[in-house]
Amino acid sequence: NEGKLRSYLIEITANILRHKDKTGGYLIDKILDAAGQKGTGKWSVINAMELGMPLGLIATAVFERSLSAQKDLRRLASKQFQCQHTQPIYNKAELVKNIFSALYASKLVSYAQGFAVLQRASDAFDWHLDLASIARMWRGGCIIRSVFLNDIAAAFEAPDKPKHLLLAPYFREEIKTLLSGWKSL
């Protein structure tokens, strides 16, 4: 949870992964792998679809949570499709670098898609949203607060506002440097 990845969700994930229970075992090994939903992701995806906007990463997360909730079906299927596990061959340093690239690029794309949906809604409903102000407001404390919200605010405050956040110079260059590692996974 340092540098470019610093965010609330990474922070709480790291805390969960590090936490040990009373017996000294990791808590993560005792958490049921069946997630529920409150509906905000689903609502976001439905709204994006109604506006004709892609929100692929969030949609995938919603679908994966739905699949996660089907624990009995997954258990049954895993018995039907057992395979021989092999030891993966990889360079640990390269793997860590590629995971960083994939995670950071995915976060950038997810935020870019979300802000594109906000812009489309603002245009469609004549809301006159100030996307830079929204980014600054989210920095202060919400579930999606992240260190690069500063860069998002700066992009929307630039004299030549981008048509899409990924086309803003900072984000374009970040994605270019991350693309190879992201694709390798």
Predicted regions and their residues:
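C-terminal substrate-binding/catalytic lobe of Rossmann-fold NAD(P)-dependent dehydrogenases
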Residues: 1-185
